[in-house]
Amino acid sequence: MNRTVDSDTVIVGAGIAGLCAARELVAAGRSVILLDKARGVGGRMATRRLGSAVCDHGAQFFTVRGRAFGGIVAEAHEAGAVVEWCRGFSRDGSLGGHGGDGHARWRGGRGMTDLPREIAAALIGEASGGRCTIRTGAKVVAVTTADGRVQIPLDDTTTLSAAGCILTPPVPQSLDLLTAGGLTAAARKSAEPAAWATLEQVAYDPCFALMLVLDRPSRVPPPGGIQFDAAAGGPIAWIADNQQKGISPVPVLTIHADGAFSRRHFDTPPDEVMTLLIDHARPWIKGDPATAVIEKSLHRWKFALPTTIIPEPLVAISHTPPIACAGDAFAGPRVEGAASSGLAAGRWLARVLAGEAARG
């Protein structure tokens, strides 16, 4: 049976951008329903278990430059949810190829999901006054408007009706939801044509993340990461030893393919992709990979790294009712860029709704 649930605001996507947007809205006294189709929060700040092995297979670390995100990280650090990993990585896999620049690289205490989980726990805790609800496993099928409100139908026949909405998935997915709801510049006069043009130019590289559980320590140099220079020309962009990183009790590698390889082999059978990447990773695996690799798993990130960056922290699709897109394609492709985008989007929506209330 169809049912409609009224909400003050709705945020689609419970990655770092969506969580930070919710944080701002709750601080402004707004109630929030935060939706994500995955089983948990965090988005690409993702940690996986393979038996007793623990590995980050999405974002590998983050840096802090700005005060706003720095405050969030400081709170999480005090709670033990994040720790400093190092100040740089080898650029070529050698002990002498260290690329330190003095900036701290942070990681989750037990994996990269620890930071988003810490933010989520605070949002649904007593301090928020019950103003935030997080629904995982919730698939949004469209975003539209009716009667001056945003309508967000879910695949379970529930429709959320909100005063305002923030979309934080990868931009192509957000555009698909808006298009499914009929919110195109041609179909809706109040839509922002310039906003659509800006969003439609955003593109992403895919990325294969290969996880390899090893029977012995790897050859990855301390502190457990190799961030290859693009000029190196190989198909591997990154290798991490999650045991050296401090999150896994046993040796397990995370290998990220570069954008060119991932595009070229995106539809290649997974076993073939794993064979190719393992062959290129041989120098950092002790022994014959045929016996040294005791378990393996491949994850395919379709929208891994934005190749087009929108300098503004958000793009407003509609002002009446307010709808905005935010996330990792805004203000920089790093974790901090996504967080800063979410914070800005949350503040924007709170201001718009406060202005509407004042005028009413």
Give names to the regions the model predicted:
Residues 136-150:
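A conserved short coil-to-beta-strand element within the FAD-binding core of flavoproteins
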Residues 26-50:
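Glycine-rich FAD pyrophosphate-binding loop
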Residues 244-248, 298-325, 329-331:
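FAD-binding beta-loop-beta segment adjacent to the flavin cofactor pocket
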Residues 5-7, 155-164:
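Core beta-strand elements of the Rossmann-like FAD/NAD(P) dinucleotide-binding domain
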Residues 7-34, 346-350:
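N-terminal Rossmann-like FAD-binding beta1-loop-alpha1 element of flavoenzymes
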Residues 61-69, 94-120, 267-276:
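Short beta-strand to alpha-helix junction loop
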Residues 42, 50, 162-223, 287-291:
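Central helical "cap/lid" subdomain
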Residues 205, 217, 247-302:
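Flavin-binding catalytic cores
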